[in-house]
Amino acid sequence: MRIQTRYVVLFLTLVVQASTSLVQQGIGALVPFIAAALALDHAHVGIAVASMSAGSAAFTALSGIAVDYFGERAVILSTGVATGLALVGASLVPSYGWLVFWLFVFGIGYGASTPAGGRAVLLWFTKDRGFAMGVRQTGVPVGGLVGTLLLPLVASHAGYRWALAAGGLLCIALSTAAALAYRSPDGAAHVSAQPLGELWRGMLRIARSAESLAVNATCGLLVSAQYVVISFLALSLISRAHAGIQLAAAALAVVQAAAAVGRLLWGTVSDRVFGGDRMAPMAVLCVIAAAGMLWLAALRHPSAPAALGVAAVLGLSAAAWNGLFAAVQAEIGGPERAGSSLGVGLTAIYGAGALAPPLFGALVDRAGFALAWHVLSAVVLLGVLPALTARRLLRAQRAAAAAA
């Protein structure tokens, strides 16, 4: 019964992640509609997209503590409702400033969904954790894929505001249903009964640890690539490569589909091939993502196979590292600090995600897409160094624990 239950829990965490990610990851498909309706340049588009990450970065550490204190179920329910209401709020005001504000509020709620789901997986899965985290993290690209297909369809008929409202209502419904169905494993109640002061001190210890710093440096560079690809791939293919809007939308959908496959693939590889090592695969992903962006920069008048091929490479690399991050960061914190540890890591990641799109958009406005993709490729390649450093530190930590 426990084996069956843990996979039900895994499915519920996937549903929550998908519902909250529908707009967060599908926003790239709405960008052309928002830019046209509000007459925005690339830099302002980047700021709007980045406001979601800014909200997450500002409050994710606190939400991680909330997960460890109140439990994952309460946080899943409250954040699902909050993110949905924020999107409905964004749909009610046809103003750029208010759009940025409500997307920031949405980001606050979105940032808490990963610590809650990550803690649930950590508690229910004692083995095959990389695979389980990969499955849960497929909710991000699955939600993005649904958003990529659904949101522009609604926007083309009724405008981007109705698309945001539809995404918000769907988020509320699915998150509420999943939270009501979720149950913690037997014996987990005491984990959530720690004093707030001790949770705060534990989070600070994790934030200062060399292992966590190295992991988050790598993931901060990878998330920069991921958010830029999701936000600007369609615009790049249309404006620089002169692809049609249908091909550009299809490429964005391929990114999300490939990311879903990649998160499962890399999670399984880390469990079965690398023996639980999450950082060696992450170093490989940095190299593949950098190569994919160089390929994208070289595209001019691409054929459909070329455009979809580069999208698949970017999805399998730049958008497929998340399960590895969630697994290693939760393992650093352990059952008692899983939410706090994920909150620390996500704060760094969302901070990078908030900076990357507007900086990339500003660079595009000044130098064009080709140079911007080359610069981002070089930056992502730097992630190999902290990935290998984290791998060495974590292996030494495990060896010391085994010797003790």
State where each predicted segment sits.
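Extracytoplasmic gate region of multi-pass secondary transporters
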Residues: 27-28, 211-264
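Juxtamembrane intracellular "pre-TM" segments in multi-pass secondary transporters
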Residues: 1-3, 185-216
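Cytoplasmic membrane-interface "Motif A"-like loop-to-helix N-cap segments
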Residues: 69-80, 272-286
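A late C-terminal transmembrane helix in Major Facilitator Superfamily
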Residues: 332-369, 376
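Helix-loop-helix hairpin linking two adjacent transmembrane segments in secondary transporters
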Residues: 135-184
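Cytoplasmic helix-loop-helix junction between adjacent transmembrane helices
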Residues: 102-140
